[in-house]
Amino acid sequence: MSQNKRVVITGMGALSPIGNDVKTTWENALKGVNGIDKITRIDTEPYSVHLAGELKNFNIEDHIDKKEARRMDRFTQYAIVAAREAVKDAQLDINENTADRIGVWIGSGIGGMETFEIAHKQLMDKGPRRVSPFFVPMLIPDMATGQVSIDLGAKGPNGATVTACATGTNSIGEAFKIVQRGDADAMITGGTEAPITHMAIAGFSASRALSTNDDIETACRPFQEGRDGFVMGEGAGILVIESLESAQARGANIYAEIVGYGTTGDAYHITAPAPEGEGGSRAMQAAMDDAGIEPKDVQYLNAHGTSTPVGDLNEVKAIKNTFGEAAKHLKVSSTKSMTGHLLGATGGIEAIFSALSIKDSKVAPTIHAVTPDPECDLDIVPNEAQDLDITYAMSNSLGFGGHNAVLVFKKFEA
């Protein structure tokens, strides 16, 4: 059996509520910029939820031909824009000689929800003949991968993961394993989501998952007293990851190394996490085992931290159970306090934050930290970014259905 290949991050692309590229998103994260505001895309008057993390000053026609864009749901559009940025950042040349060894693995938690709503109205109002022939290709979650592959010409391993809020992290983890075992030289991977629609807002509201707080400064407050649910966000986070051999051969810039991946199932409940965060704890331990490290080796953890009453507390318990005494010295921040919860895209954005934290020796804060929950007594990097020399960083994603996914990143050393 051949030795596992080392896997490094060489490119990044982002669309988020705090920036339309990686540079802006990261700068605003370090500044503690709040990307949550009143929803403008739909009329929220009938709903109890009125806030979300929308993209700002973003026009898809600046990036994709208008005719082509009309044949894609927003989640696919976002993936293409972020993937192009990541590939450009990596200076990755996809040509007839390399295409077979470059793959795409991008997930979406719910796919084309807006497309479904439009098509359903057409069907009900005007009958089946008015439903677009592009309806199914626009709807299905794997189409982000499909369209990015077509757009960039990448012909290697090609797939999509759908694990709700763990989607982005699971996608990167699966792509990591593909490169690690030598099935591809590079993968374009991450998550994308466009969930700010009538049906998504109504559905998540019905499940009592969303915050009904109309104050943009307190609606999303992970690990704080009085938190009442998550605030939805939209966007995409895409990485180019590749074997160290490939990256060094072409002189690529390396942000960080991916060294561990753990994924588990709760087998407990369709929306609630397992008691004491047992499933998340096992995923964190699996990721550390995969990386060959111990809890004391990790300096920073980008938490799932969605601002739900049960979810935050269970994640804190999981961290304490996994890290033991080392949890007292761990920096743990929830960047969702700034971006909102991007569902399937969140793991991609937070992988970018984790890698840049290592590279820049800075940790983005948990903003809105003014009324700490005494049961969530970790160092959550309150309100202001902190300088921190990081060797290992971890990123958690925990999804409806009991999906738990964790990645471990390492400061790159040749």
Curated annotation (Swiss-Prot):
Database matches in InterPro entries: 3-oxoacyl-ACP_synth-2, Beta-ketoacyl_synthase, Ketoacyl_synth_AS, Ketoacyl_synth_C, Ketoacyl_synth_N, PKS_Beta-ketoAc_synthase_dom, Thiolase-like
Catalytic activity: a fatty acyl-[ACP] + malonyl-[ACP] + H(+) = a 3-oxoacyl-[ACP] + holo-[ACP] + CO2; (9Z)-hexadecenoyl-[ACP] + malonyl-[ACP] + H(+) = 3-oxo-(11Z)-octadecenoyl-[ACP] + holo-[ACP] + CO2
Active site: 165, 304, 341
Gene Ontology MF term list: 3-oxoacyl-[acyl-carrier-protein] synthase activity
Alphabetically ordered keywords of this record: Acyltransferase, Fatty acid biosynthesis, Fatty acid metabolism, Lipid biosynthesis, Lipid metabolism, Transferase
Keyword match Lipid metabolism: yes
An annotated GO BP: fatty acid biosynthetic process
CDD domains per record: KAS_I_II
Enzyme class: transferase
Gene3D superfamilies in the cross-refs: 3.40.47.10
Transferase found in the keyword field: yes
Pathway in which this enzyme or protein is active: Lipid metabolism; fatty acid biosynthesis
Ketosynthase family 3 (KS3) domain location: 4-411
GO (cellular component) term, any one: cytosol
Protein purpose: Involved in the type II fatty acid elongation cycle. Catalyzes the elongation of a wide range of acyl-ACP by the addition of two carbons from malonyl-ACP to an acyl acceptor. Can efficiently catalyze the conversion of palmitoleoyl-ACP (cis-hexadec-9-enoyl-ACP) to cis-vaccenoyl-ACP (cis-octadec-11-enoyl-ACP), an essential step in the thermal regulation of fatty acid composition.
Family membership: Belongs to the thiolase-like superfamily. Beta-ketoacyl-ACP synthases family.
Name of the protein described by the UniProt record: 3-oxoacyl-[acyl-carrier-protein] synthase 2
